[in-house]
UniProtKB/Swiss-Prot annotation:
One record GO biological process: tRNA pseudouridine synthesis
Self-association and partners: Homodimer.
Family: Belongs to the tRNA pseudouridine synthase TruA family.
Alphabetic keyword roster: Isomerase, tRNA processing
Binding, substrate: Y110
EC numbers on record: 5.4.99.12
Reaction catalysis annotation: uridine(38/39/40) in tRNA = pseudouridine(38/39/40) in tRNA
Pfam family, one: PseudoU_synth_1
Keyword tRNA processing attached: yes
UniProt-recorded name of the protein: tRNA pseudouridine synthase A
Coiled-coil features, chain-numbered ranges: none
Active site: D52
Gene that produces this protein: truA
Amino acid sequence: MRNIKLIIEFDGSNFCGWQRQPKGRTIQKVIETAIFKATGEEIMINGSSRTDAGVHAREMVANFLTNSSIPGDKFREAINTRLPEDVSIIKSEEVSEDFHARYSSKGKTYSYTIINRYERLSLGHQYLYHYKYRLDVNEMRRACEYFIGRHDFRAFMSPGSSIKTTTRTIHDLYIDQNGNEIKIFITADGFLYNMVRIIVGTLIKIGNGKLEVENIKDIIEEGNRKKAGMCVPPNGLILEKVFY
């Protein structure tokens, strides 16, 4: 069996997330269907992340095992010609048998985009979160420092996960601002369920003055989900890169 690695870009607006479901359109399902059409093999692909409905990716990584004779770098074209317009294989290559898109990963970078103006945005609204009240970006930047490092992030996780540990290491968290566009970048060795979206919601709570920067330390130590911010909508979230 050969092991093929894919780098995938997708617009998650019209998907029910990455993971195959009995009902609903998923990224995993459309790619597996395209591979079946290209090779005649019913395979299961492993994704680096299980993104939720509405979340996008610039560089999702996946891998699958195949007996096909298609050269590794030619799978890109073979699959792309059978995919819908909102999913694209950016690169394909044959890798070692022990590579696994999820379990071999050392970390990921996500971005989240906020448009901070009173008027809602009509163009490109599916890729950002509209927040109409003024945000103090300098205070939000100060708050970023409290998240960096190895902590128990259970206060920033939505219920419904069965993971064994809620401790993660955030390597970097910073904010770029261009006019009324605020873009938050976060890199970590792993993420809890909705962790990025809740951290962004907490930064918004700092930015609108409803939470003090110094309270972040207490929220992390107490692990109290109710004291953290809201879970912002998925559409502003993009998986930017996966590290190996």
